[in-house]
From Swiss-Prot:
GO annotation (BP), single: DNA recombination
Native source species: Chlamydia trachomatis serovar D (strain ATCC VR-885 / DSM 19411 / UW-3/Cx)
Domain of life: Bacteria
Record has Coiled coil as a keyword: yes
Name of this chain's protein: DNA recombination protein RmuC homolog
Coiled coil region boundaries: 112-162
InterPro entries named in the record: DNA_recombination_RmuC
Pfam families: RmuC
Family: Belongs to the RmuC family.
Record's function text: Involved in DNA recombination.
Keywords: Coiled coil, DNA recombination
Length: 427
């Protein structure tokens, strides 16, 4: 389409140039016609003069007296003719020079435009060739990617033709959703759990809820090979297989095999298209599943449910930490109470030691120190140090004071405190 537009534009420019040149040629022809008309008129004048000359020449025989006049007239006519010829030649040269310059000045922009158009056309063709090469390369890459996608799709189709592979695919999708939602495998859920009483009743995923409760999820992916391989397959067969699987889950009664499990099981459909096609074909499917204690779940709804469970676990962990902090505070209070008893005992013994020290100091000062000072007066000792009197200890140890009333603190840390109690099982 672009090449055709460019070709049409070039033809239009050429036609314009042809009409323009034709107009200039007609103008030159019209000017030349005027010039020829003037020249013809001059020739007529010359012929008239020559005719007059002939008449005069004929009269010259009879009128010899007029020979000199005729000769002068002849010279005058010759000079006039030559001057007229020179003037006409000069005017013709100037006229054609002006017209040539005018035509050149008019055609110069057209020439420049055509040159620029030619250059742009060459650049466009070069760019178009490069674009065609790039487009060819992109189409080749797209074809390669499409072939690769087709091979991978075919491989996935071949794998999912087997019921076991479809079940495993559903479990992998479910584990991925559990990982994204924060339900880590080592603490919040377990896979392939088998009840000890009946080994045939195996749950794909058992979500552990707070207070030792459980939530069972099944991911057996009930859809047929025809639904997988045919894009225009009738979803009626899909609905039938889902209903059959709902009946199977109802007979298994997972809620009876796991302690404190809700009386329902979640049937996970590992694709929004599966869920939407089934509900679009059978809007009553949700009610049918609910009557069998089965809840249908797509990846989006299961993600929201697991996010809620994650939040519940966070709240449960927070409550456990609060209870643990309360228990630690209670233990700390009891230990500090014991420590304060030891402080009181130490203070009491320190007070007794101070009294004993003061009694001993008084006894030494009253009975022993006077005798020792008598020895100092007798200079019996070679030491120049004198025995100083013992000082009394007047400061007694103080008992530490509890910053809060003992009864209030004991009440806050008592086992009956509300935040130290675990939530009741019926909440």
């Amino acid at each position: 389409m672009g090449v055709f537009a460019i070709s049409l534009l070039s033809q239009t420019v050429c036609l314009y140039f042809t009409f323009f040149s034709l107009g200039i040629a007609l103008g030159v022809l019209f000017s030349f016609k005027i010039f020829t008309k003037k020249l013809s008129r001059q020739h007529e004048i010359i012929r008239d003069l020559e005719h007059s000359k002939a008449i005069l020449q004929m009269s010259l025989d009879t009128r010899r007296s007029q020979e000199q006049l005729m000769e002068e007239f002849s010279h005058k006519l010759t000079s006039v003719s030559q001057a007229f010829a020179r003037d006409m030649k000069t005017e013709s040269q100037e006229f054609f020079s002006e017209k040539t310059q005018a035509i050149t000045s008019v055609l110069a922009p057209v020439h420049n435009t055509l040159s620029a158009f030619k250059q742009n056309l060459e650049n466009f063709e070069t760019k178009q060739a490069e674009d065609r090469g790039a487009l060819k390369e992109q189409l080749s890459q797209l074809l390669t990617a499409e072939q690769k996608l087709e091979r991978e799709t075919q491989a996935l189709t071949n794998i999912l033709k087997h019921p076991g592979s479809r079940g495993r695919w559903g479990e992998i999708q479910l584990e991925r959703i559990l990982e994204i939602s924060g339900m880590l495998k080592y603490c919040d859920y377990s896979t392939q759990t088998v009840d000890s009483s009946e080994s045939s009743s195996r749950a794909d995923i058992v979500i552990r809820l707070p207070q030792n409760r459980s939530l069972v999820i099944d991911a057996k992916t009930p859809f047929s090979e025809e639904y997988l391989t045919d894009n225009h397959a009738d979803p009626t067969d899909l609905v039938k297989k889902i209903k059959d699987h709902i009946k199977t889950l109802k007979t298994k009664s997972y809620w009876d095999k796991f302690e404190q499990s809700p009386e329902f099981v979640i049937l996970f459909l590992p694709g929004e298209s599966l869920f939407n096609d089934a509900i679009r074909c059978a809007p009553e499917l949700m009610d049918y599943a609910g009557q069998s204690n089965v809840i249908l779940s797509s990846p989006v709804t299961l993600m929201a449910l697991l996010k809620t469970v994650t939040h519940v676990w966070k709240q449960e962990n927070l409550q456990n930490q609060i209870r643990e902090i309360g228990q630690l505070g209670k233990d700390l209070y009891q230990r500090m109470h014991k420590l304060f008893d030891h402080f009181h005992k130490v203070g009491k013994h320190l007070g007794q030691a101070v009294h004993s020290y003061n009694d001993m100091s008084s006894s030494l000062s009253a009975r022993v120190l006077p005798i020792l000072r008598t020895f100092d007066k007798l200079e019996l000792s070679s030491s120049h140090n004198k025995i100083e009197a013992l000082s009394q200890v007047s400061t007694l140890p103080h008992s530490p004071k509890v910053p809060y009333p003992e009864n209030d603190l004991a009440e806050c840390l008592s086992p009956e405190a509300s935040y130290l109690k675990p939530p009741s099982s019926n909440q």
